[in-house]
């Protein structure tokens, strides 16, 4: 099953997440099919907190991909901002 989920990057105590389309059997930070955005929970000042390609997310959902709980909330946030 294909899932749209967060893949952690960044340094220790400074998380930065890529929003990726991946096979659910792949490791969290492992192989992925496509990168559709990023999420920076510690963004300060005028740094961008969330960037998401909603067209690609919707295309993957139409193909049967499921969203993780956190990504689902981020998609709603991005749709509200757009």
From Swiss-Prot:
Show the GO MF annotations. structural constituent of ribosome
Q: Which GO terms describe its cellular component?
A: cytoplasm; small ribosomal subunit
Keywords, sorted A to Z:
Ribonucleoprotein, Ribosomal protein
Say which domain of life the source belongs to: Bacteria
The record's annotation in InterPro entries points to:
Ribosomal_bS16, Ribosomal_bS16_CS, Ribosomal_bS16_dom_sf
PROSITE patterns for the chain: RIBOSOMAL_S16 (PS00732)
Q: Where is the signal peptide?
A: none
> Can you supply a Gene Ontology BP term from the record?
translation
Pfam families registered for this protein in UniProt: Ribosomal_S16 (PF00886)
Q: Which family does it belong to?
A: Belongs to the bacterial ribosomal protein bS16 family.
Q: What is this protein called?
A: Small ribosomal subunit protein bS16
């Amino acid at each position: 099953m294909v899932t749209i989920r967060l893949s952690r990057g960044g340094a220790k105590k400074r998380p930065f997440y890529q929003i990726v389309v991946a096979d659910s059997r792949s490791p969290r930070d492992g192989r992925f099919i496509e990168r559709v955005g990023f999420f920076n929970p510690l963004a300060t000042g005028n740094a961008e907190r969330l960037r998401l390609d909603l067209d690609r997310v919707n295309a993957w959902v139409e193909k049967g991909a499921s969203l993780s709980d956190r990504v689902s909330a981020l998609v709603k946030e991005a749709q509200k901002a757009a």
